[in-house]
């Protein structure tokens, strides 16, 4: 009945329900049916699905703003170049942005990608002035969409984040540890696009996640 109401196949409905169950938005009770998880409705920011940072800030109840700190060509770091499957002679590029919530430091992002992804050397000057989402720029240029990512989670003292103190003071960063995500972003065709170091002030953005249990009884 639901498939007919929405005009889609049963397979599509089943996949959508599986996705909602994986996110904890609905849960299934054997022999009883499928129910909405009321607790999930109160979650503002979750790890999956991943949303844009400005959207996270809005959902957390703040007004977002973004500062483009720097976009530059940097010396190749072979570990990062290998993760991005870059060409042997391809230039590595890094973009640094600061995200603010009601003018307070909320997150710092350092994104690495290959020069070929943004149109090569001749396009660099134009790109270096681009302040919107890097993923939107890549999509508009190449049609490549960031579809999924692989994340390693850690914590870090904000005063120890390499290179950040040249943009802001230690006092502005606060004293609480930041959540540190090392993220490799992939396209729909499983091609690595951007390697990101993301640092979150969890006094402002609080991540929540509903997890399924897999306990052997």
Which sequence ranges carry the predicted segments?
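N-terminal helix-turn-helix
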Residues: 1-36
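C-terminal all-alpha effector/ligand-binding and dimerization domain
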Residues: 65-217
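Extended, compositionally biased flexible segments
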Residues: 28, 51-54, 58-62
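A generic "binding-loop/recognition-motif" signal
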Residues: 32, 53, 134
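Short, cationic-aromatic polyanion-contact patches
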Residues: 35-49
């Amino acid at each position: 009945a639901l498939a007919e109401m929405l005009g889609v196949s049963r397979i599509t409905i089943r996949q959508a329900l599986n996705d909602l169950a994986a996110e904890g938005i609905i849960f299934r009770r054997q022999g009883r049916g499928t129910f909405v998880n009321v607790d999930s409705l109160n979650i503002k920011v979750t790890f999956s699905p991943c949303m844009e940072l400005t959207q996270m800030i809005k959902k957390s109840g703040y007004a977002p703003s973004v500062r483009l700190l720097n976009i530059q060509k940097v010396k190749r770091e072979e570990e990062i170049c290998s993760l991005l499957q870059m060409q042997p002679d391809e230039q590595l590029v890094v973009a640094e942005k600061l995200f603010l919530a009601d003018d307070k430091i909320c997150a710092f992002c350092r994104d690495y990608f290959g020069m070929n992804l943004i149109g090569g050397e001749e396009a660099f000057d134009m790109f270096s002035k681009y302040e919107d989402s890097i993923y939107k720029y890549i999509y508009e240029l190449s049609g490549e969409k960031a579809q999924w990512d692989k994340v390693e989670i850690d914590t870090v003292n904000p005063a120890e984040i390499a290179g950040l103190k040249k943009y802001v003071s230690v006092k502005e960063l606060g004293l609480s540890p930041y959540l540190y995500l090392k993220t490799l972003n992939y396209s729909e065709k499983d091609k690595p696009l951007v390697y990101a170091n993301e640092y979150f002030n969890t006094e402002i953005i609080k991540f929540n996640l509903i997890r399924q249990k897999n306990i052997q009884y």
